[in-house]
Curated annotation (Swiss-Prot):
Name of the protein this chain belongs to: Tyrosine-protein phosphatase non-receptor type 20
The entry's keywords: Cytoplasm, Cytoskeleton, Hydrolase, Microtubule, Nucleus, Phosphoprotein, Protein phosphatase
Catalytic reaction(s) noted: O-phospho-L-tyrosyl-[protein] + H2O = L-tyrosyl-[protein] + phosphate
Gene: Ptpn20
Location in the cell: Nucleus; Cytoplasm; Cytoplasm, Cytoskeleton, Microtubule organizing center, Centrosome
Ranges of biased composition (kind: Basic residues): 1-10
Family: Belongs to the protein-tyrosine phosphatase family. Non-receptor class subfamily.
Active site: C359
Segments for region (Disordered): 1-58, 95-124
Tyrosine-protein phosphatase domain mapped to chain residues: 165-418
Enzyme Commission code(s) on record: 3.1.3.48
Gene3D superfamilies tied to this protein: Protein tyrosine phosphatase superfamily
Amino acid sequence: MSSPRKVRGKTGRDNDEEEGNSGNLNLRNSLPSSSQKMTPTKPIFGNKMNSENVKPSHHLSFSDKYELVYPEPLESDTDETVWDVSDRSLRNRWNSMDSETAGPSKTVSPVLSGSSRLSKDTETSVSEKELTQLAQIRPLIFNSSARSAMRDCLNTLQKKEELDIIREFLELEQMTLPDDFNSGNTLQNRDKNRYRDILPYDSTRVPLGKNKDYINASYIRIVNHEEEYFYIATQGPLPETIEDFWQMVLENNCNVIAMITREIECGVIKCYSYWPISLKEPLEFEHFSVFLETFHVTQYFTVRVFQIVKKSTGKSQCVKHLQFTKWPDHGTPASADFFIKYVRYVRKSHITGPLLVHCSAGVGRTGVFICVDVVFSAIEKNYSFDIMNIVTQMRKQRCGMIQTKEQYQFCYEIVLEVLQNLLALY
């Protein structure tokens, strides 16, 4: 079920949120760690994790062109470094743009829309009423037996102490994982990584083109009750990898991109703005043109619709870009409500190819999204689910998925809220 300037990589292991520090942008050989504060470290390539295997957890069931800035680090709130964003091209870009823009995620009115050529295929408007309805996940079968089983599931979750959840996360941290990071560690690919220790496994990395070129992205397949949920988890594009990113979108026939970060958070650049911000001017690359067709800004996420045109053939593909803008600078959202609605809208929008998800490093918030999306699908189909098992599967396919204990706890909080809201209706 399917569901050109360079920056140095950093490490993301010890970060709480999704980004980290920076070093001297002119130090080509420096790959600072996200666990450090302001001082870059010596390059260390690779991230071998050896330990005991994770133990099974209780199975829960309720069922019988514009080069602007240098992007920044990973999913954590422990790193306080800021990239240099004083580039004149950045200032000139924003000073010269027309008023019809849908670029950086900034504070806006609750509803703002724009369009160059609105059609049924590119309509982006979404009402809060629709989102509220989407958040009310309803199982296929919800008779008295199913409701009773769901209450049992809810009770089991509610009885889990915070310490139990933390213990689960610590077990996940001790998993023995693959150690095949050869592609990401080659000299020609090191500058394509945002962090030196967040690399895709060779076995699950997303290859580009006939030559199987490198991008820091991983295929993630989660199996639950014989159903497979298919994703691409990737880091936020760097200036030098933007065209690679769009190539990946086209080659994998992805019709949805879920972006779970703002471009700048707490003064730190989290992700390079890789899309056109004007309805009148496309973003041009060597092989592709990206057009902004329409956009719609809600209180907590922005919808953009792009047409990506391959210059050699003239073929185009429509892609919906959904950017969640209410994840706080540090920690996790205080309320799960906005994120639940966002995840459900992303799932509703998905049609073809793997669902492409990214934050900054493509592991922390990205992991939370994938985990709860799988659980929501399980609830809809009256399937049992096991959060620890889902995260275990993710980590076997991309290192560090769900980076912090706070993010792991947030998954439980989200699921609890969904189940409580569902049972309250009956």
